Amino acid sequence: MKLFIDTANIEEIREAYALGIICGVTTNPSLIAREGRNFAQVVREIAAIVDGPISAEAVSPDAAGMIAEAEELSSIHPNIVVKIPMTAEGLKAVKILAQKGIRTNVTLIFSANQALLAARAGASYVSPFVGRLDDVSQDGAALIYDIMEIFERHCIRTEVIAASIRHPVHVTMAAKAGAHIATVPYKVLMQMIGHPLTEAGIKKFLEDWEKVKDK
């Protein structure tokens, strides 16, 4: 399973990419707004760091507006993938954008039926929101399993991005369920690195080395 980072913070992206663990970035209007900077400039800086897909969101409610935004976004850099919401208007936009060769990531997926419709409309990626389902006592991992089973059985090439990741367990669940990609916040990526037993083991090795290094 590939890992993307879910952020618009340049320093977080730079640090995660330096570790060799991410190959793409997802953003949304909230993440961009948090940085308080020009959107196009942020995207260009991201593209200079990560040579992989960069998801940026269209916010218009209607298909015509989404298409216009998508064309503008995709002109910023060839690695741009346009995030489109899972609505009827979104599906119309995805179909036309696919015909134009503009890649899309259909977001706010909460059912296997939604994922299937998005894929059939021509989405390059679908993003089921694992954490938000868990927040309302539904099974986010089960949704990934269902989508993957349907896509594999029907030879659907759309890639599945496990999104709305809250903690490292969500990443493990997504990997076990067969998701192609998990997009993970910086904080969770850092949590995945550490383990108390790893830290204790390093401390013990250093203590033992200090005892024998001068003998």
UniProtKB/Swiss-Prot annotation:
SUPFAM superfamilies: Aldolase (SSF51569). It comes from the Bacteria. The keyword Cytoplasm applies. It is an enzyme of class 2 (transferase). It catalyses: D-sedoheptulose 7-phosphate + D-glyceraldehyde 3-phosphate = D-erythrose 4-phosphate + beta-D-fructose 6-phosphate. GO terms for biological process: carbohydrate metabolic process; pentose-phosphate shunt. HAMAP family: Transaldolase_3b. Transaldolase is important for the balance of metabolites in the pentose-phosphate pathway. This is Probable transaldolase. It comes from Pelotomaculum thermopropionicum (strain DSM 13744 / JCM 10971 / SI).
